[in-house]
Amino acid sequence: MKYSVKQTALEQENKSLFIAIFENQELSPAALKLDLKLKGEITEAVKNGEVSGKIGRILVLRHGAQRIILVGCGKQNEVTERQYKQIIQKAVKTAKETIATTIINALTEVKIKDRDLYWNVRFAVETIEEDNYIFEQFKSKKSENNSKLAEIIFYTEENHEQAELAIRHATAISSGVKAAKDIANCPPNICNPAYLAEQANQLAGRSSLIETTVIGEKEMRKLGMNAYLAVSCGSKNEAKLSVMEYRNHENPNAKPIVLAGKGLTFDAGGISLKPAADMDEMKYDMCGAASVYGVMNAIAELQLPLNVIGVMAGCENLPDGNAYRPGDILTTMSGLTVEVLNTDAEGRLVLCDTLTYVERFEPELVIDVATLTGACVVALGQHNSGLVSTDDNLAQDLERAAKLANDKAWRLPLSEEYQEQLKSKFADLANLGGRWGGAITAGAFLSNFTKNYPWAHLDIAGTAWLQGQNKGATGRPVSLLVQFLLNQVK
């Protein structure tokens, strides 16, 4: 889909239009102008009840090849973000069922609570791109697309530059979300740690601002990344740590922001085997790495003036004669020892060594992203990612970004008491904290490996993919993280 911004006299346009109608028979400014040209046709349709301001109500007026799509938008100044998404989805779905090839979108006049024109335009583009996403690379028969709609022009009388910036940001973010979804939806017989490394190398080939280094198991052994390697022991696919260095800060020596993603390309649980039901979805245990990859795609497109290092910690967790066992004690790269109580609590073992590894970059801050715990899904459901942090300022910055991006996150506590649940009789730490507060104790475990930099952890176990009829990766939290990075640009 092509997007642009235009300041135009709607009443003189012959292109198809989205026009807002509000409750209480209130016409938007654009509708009033157009109604004069149409000699009261819109007013008449509202009075007759053919269309109302109720959200989701649609009426299509036909004038030659032009389609004027009247869209019910609720109460002006009281429209919520969720309602606005429904409005955009309904309007675009209707347009695709017409002969329209280009739409001038005057729904920019809809006032969303606590949002501005920039957000209105950006969220519309992101919503449209999300709904356009289809993953059928492995289907022999592709879906037919009979829609002629190819371009949406955002109508605005002012703040033209703000709207154009919104389109630029939204298209880059949507591109990043798509990239994340594509590799997350890829089957595990294809998407393994080597595949993640290949994607990282290809990204470096496409962007002169990115340099990729891939670390294999031989080098990991030299570095003492024994916790990471233990998880990989049951798989024939070698673990790969893919490091994507994006450097575009005016000061090349400026400390980088590090994003580290858990990349379990398949997690059967190891010796602590998962139940068979829904195990196919454990291909999504690499969505943390996928989201980091998506973010790196987006910032390369935006050419943000920052130094950012994206790390994909690729690995598989499978049962095998060589697999690590409950009861094993592992010496991590940091020197801390960990008693394995459950081999299905593997993500924290991969991440703890990754978090130690990234110290070499002397980071300004580190954010890890992981489908880490089912406990987080129980606590927060599928709407909010879990946020844990040892740094209040960083946590607040992420919460602010989550709100701006409408990619929700909720901060969980991280007080010292939770460390008590991680005590082991035989090692420095246990890799499991017991039944209660599992999302928090997982974060508490990781915090032991982040003493040398500000750190935050996003648990996306509930938000990274959907089940049921809409099964598939969501691309979250790419929007949140790109927004966070946009906010870091001075």
Swiss-Prot record:
Annotated Gene Ontology cellular component terms: cytoplasm
Task: Identify the keywords attached in UniProt to this record, alphabetized.
Answer: Aminopeptidase, Cytoplasm, Hydrolase, Manganese, Metal-binding, Protease
Gene3D superfamilies of this UniProt entry?
Leucine Aminopeptidase, subunit E, domain 1, Zn peptidases
Q: What is its EC number?
A: 3.4.11.1, 3.4.11.10
CDD domains recorded: Peptidase_M17
Q: Its family?
A: Belongs to the peptidase M17 family.
Q: What is this protein called?
A: Probable cytosol aminopeptidase
User: What is the originating organism of this protein?
Assistant: Mannheimia succiniciproducens (strain KCTC 0769BP / MBEL55E)
Q: What is the lineage of its organism?
A: Bacteria, Pseudomonadati, Pseudomonadota, Gammaproteobacteria, Pasteurellales
